[in-house]
Amino acid sequence: MPNIDFVGKRSFFIYLSIALILFSVIVIFVKGFNLGVDFSGGSEIIVSFDKSYTIDELRNGLQTINQEYATAKIIQTNPGGGASDQFFYIITVRDSFPTLEEKQMFINSLEESFSDSSLNIEQFNDVSGYAAREIRSYAWYAVIISLIVLLAYITIRFQFSYGVGAILALAHDVIITLGFYSLFGIEMNLTAIAAFLTLAGYSLNDTIVVYDRIRENRSKNRGMDIESITNKSINEVIVRSLNTSLTTFLVVFMMFLLGGRSIASFAFGLTVGVIIGTYSSLYIASPIVIGMVKRRKKTQKA
């Protein structure tokens, strides 16, 4: 079993976490988020051509339909060639086309703008501004409700101080991960929210492993101070935690690299979240419990 002084260095890591949270908040306020169609409203059209276009050529063609489309988000999803000899692009515009007639008018305009190529509409996803606001609201409600439920669960299973430590650690993980989404311009959509909910469960599981060992060691070593018990407990579970985190990280990182655009937001959130969650379960959740236990003892003595 390793013998690392985790607790002795807790002040450094708490200040480090505060710095990371402040950095994340600043990045979010300065850059904002790259909102997907789910959250911003608009249309996402997957089109295929039998010839290749540059992004600028596509934007110029879209601009002939509507000047605002000059800033459309365009992603090429394959290099073309092979058996199908098709070139696929994802075009995202801020307009929504709620009726079939409006969709068809837009498709006709696309065909006119790119008449030198055979165009096929592979997929047409449309989200109105109202629906986007509803989705965004319900997504964040899901995150907040999950945090409340997790607080109740930890409080019932352990003590209120443990619940506070777990929720603060989870909030720490979510804020820093949000900062990375903003910093790297990763699309914020429903799969990203799924990543945050998955991260909450993963991070909580890691924290519970540590808390369970702390509770067990407190019952066995009643004469030992809380700092020593916490340090002993973390050292007993760290190998398991790091092995689990490493294998999980490798899987989600490969998903991010190779999984394609459809799961990129989800895989990115877990790639960052596994690292931050493992760190917080060792250096944030446990020190918070130490502080609250010592504070409660002082209050009881007074």
From Swiss-Prot:
Subunit and partners: Forms a complex with SecD. Part of the essential Sec protein translocation apparatus which comprises SecA, SecYEG and auxiliary proteins SecDF. Other proteins may also be involved.
This protein's GO CC annotations: plasma membrane
Keywords: Cell inner membrane, Cell membrane, Membrane, Protein transport, Translocation, Transmembrane, Transmembrane helix, Transport
Cited InterPro entries: SecD/SecF_arch_bac, SecD/SecF_bac, SecD/SecF_CS, SecD_SecF_C, SecD_SecF_C_bact, SecF_bac
TM region positions: 12-32, 138-158, 166-186, 190-210, 249-269, 272-292
Localisation per UniProt entry: Cell inner membrane
A Pfam entry, by short name: SecD_SecF_C
Membrane topology, as annotated: Multi-pass membrane protein
Claim: Transcription regulation is one of the keywords in the record: no
Name of the coding gene: secF
Protein name: Protein translocase subunit SecF
Principal location listed in the UniProt entry: membrane
PANTHER family associated with the record: PROTEIN TRANSLOCASE SUBUNIT SECF, PROTEIN-EXPORT MEMBRANE PROTEIN SEC
GO biological process, one term: protein transport by the Sec complex
Role description: Part of the Sec protein translocase complex. Interacts with the SecYEG preprotein conducting channel. SecDF uses the proton motive force (PMF) to complete protein translocation after the ATP-dependent function of SecA.
